[in-house]
A protein has these predicted regions:
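Beta1-alpha1 glycine-rich phosphate/pyrophosphate-binding loop at the start
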Residues: 1-61, 88, 126-170, 177-178, ...
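Generic beta-strand/beta-sheet core signal
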Residues: 17-19, 58, 80-82, 95, ...
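Feature captures the FAD/FMN-dependent oxidoreductase FAD-binding
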Residues: 42-93, 176-184, 210-212, 217-223
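Glycine-rich dinucleotide-binding loop and its adjacent helix/turn
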Residues: 46-64, 87-138, 232-243, 247
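FAD-site-proximal beta/loop scaffold in flavoenzymes
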Residues: 96-116, 193, 198-261
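A conserved FAD-binding loop/helix module that cradles the flavin
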Residues: 131, 257-286
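Active-site rim loops that border cofactor/substrate pockets in soluble metabolic enzymes
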Residues: 161, 180-195
Length: 290
């Protein structure tokens, strides 16, 4: 969104490819309505279209169309801002059970899932807080977040809001598997520095109508697999240089697909810098052509 607006303001014709049915990416499908009303995105889209920006929904780059085909068709520069929308799995028994969900999948369509009264959430990040608050707003009465250590990766304000909404927090719980009854943990043993030094032998079965895994998310690798010369880092992130250009000339990237899951503010900052770099690249290319 940010890159499209910056390029349009600079006078460039812009097309945005959205792989889902509604425009907005993570803002549309990963942030709850109570935090970001969908009407805001609708107004934003209308404003972008007024600026002359074309938005193509239900179009996946990397399967329906390829980056090479975009370059073939005359696009002077391409920006990849696909984010990190693939849920990270635990790799444990029970993740495929019918009463188990991943956080981002739930947030994309919370009213489409019947969680029941009791919900166990694995994770303590900002996304996990969104999941908990959304579940409470959609009828679940007992929502508990579980973490292995005593550290919380979510911001203190998000934790406070989640507590005010009625969620509970349990620390020192190492998940081993998930059953139809709910998650199974082993309690962690801490030393005086709150460091984990072991686990109790007896497993603890938690009874939950639904278990939601919300530990993190990572970028999908489809674009790298389908685009020659587009490389990833050891972490599976899009590799870019100091000007946000990828290893494929003319193709840029920023946001979670480059940094891993971070805040929207961080993604917007990177997008602004990437847009400026794209403009410099295209202006230089135009000068050399003339």
């Amino acid at each position: 969104m940010t890159v499209a607006i910056k390029l349009a303001e600079a006078g460039y014709p812009v097309t945005v490819f959205e792989w889902k049915g509604k425009f907005g990416g993570l803002l549309q499908y990963g942030i709850p309505e109570f935090r970001l009303p969908k009407s805001f995105l609708e107004r934003y889209q209308a404003r972008m279209e007024e600026m002359g920006i074309t938005i193509r929904t239900n179009t996946t780059i990397g399967s329906v169309l390829m980056i090479d085909e975009l370059l073939r068709d005359g696009y002077s520069s391409i920006f990849i801002g696909t984010g990190a929308e693939k849920p990270r799995t635990l790799g444990l028994q029970g993740e495929s059970l019918g009463n188990v969900l991943f956080g981002l999948n739930y947030l994309a369509n919370p009213r489409g899932h019947k969680l029941g009264d009791t919900v166990a959430i694995i994770g303590m990040g900002n996304a996990a807080m969104d999941v908990a608050r959304t579940a409470l707003r959609n009828g679940s009465r007992h929502v508990t977040l579980y973490a292995r250590s005593k550290n919380v990766t979510a911001s203190s304000s998000e934790v406070s809001y989640t507590e005010l909404d009625g969620a509970e927090f349990v620390f020192g719980m190492h998940i081993e598997k998930i059953t139809d009854e709910g998650p199974v943990f082993r309690k962690a043993v801490f030393n005086e520095k709150d460091e984990i030094i072991g686990y109790e032998e007896e497993p603890v079965q938690i009874h939950a109508d639904s278990t939601i895994i919300s530990i993190s998310q990572v970028p999908r690798r489809k674009l790298a697999r389908t685009t020659e010369g587009l490389e990833l880092t050891d972490r599976g992130l899009l590799e870019v240089d100091e000007n946000y250009m990828t290893t494929r000339p003319g193709v840029f990237g920023a946001g979670d697909v480059v940094t891993g899951a971070k805040t929207v503010v961080h993604a917007v900052d990177g997008a602004k810098k990437a847009a400026a770099a794209m403009i410099r690249y295209m202006e230089r290319d135009l000068t050399e052509t003339n």
